[in-house]
């Protein structure tokens, strides 16, 4: 059973709203971007995105479903020949709403709704970023695994007695030598990372 949409009818009846959305969608597909009031733009967005989803499928049935709403055959042809295939690898989010200054006469909130024309590479970029991060973590973990067993081993009893008998100056020298070896290990890791990135 058909039920009316919730909320206001954009200043008219349900038939007026259907005609209004069809005309706005026709203008959007023809020009790529239109300026309208913000409530109309928000109502147009799901309407237009459903039509683009039909165009992506490209079957005769989908073309007839779109023709029920958009009566201009030229616009339907553009929708199925150009716009639908352009978004073939994108799942939703075909339009963008940008708020602009209010209308001068009645101070109505205005917005520009446009088709998103940029190709998204976020999934490929995220995949590459994750692979680089995994390589860096693996490269950092491998030298640390080799260094950690040396660090975890405690000094032997003879070495402990020798360290206890040495003056404080010798202890400071040992600490400095330890930090130098750590900085050398970090330099080696940085060099290995730069070689991996060069590959």
From Swiss-Prot:
Region (Disordered) location: 138-199
Keywords: Ribonucleoprotein, Ribosomal protein
Biased composition (Low complexity): 138-149
One Gene Ontology MF term: structural constituent of ribosome
GO cellular component: cytosolic large ribosomal subunit
Family recorded in the similarity comment: Belongs to the bacterial ribosomal protein bL17 family.
The protein's assembly and partners: Part of the 50S ribosomal subunit. Contacts protein L32.
Protein name: Large ribosomal subunit protein bL17
Gene: rplQ
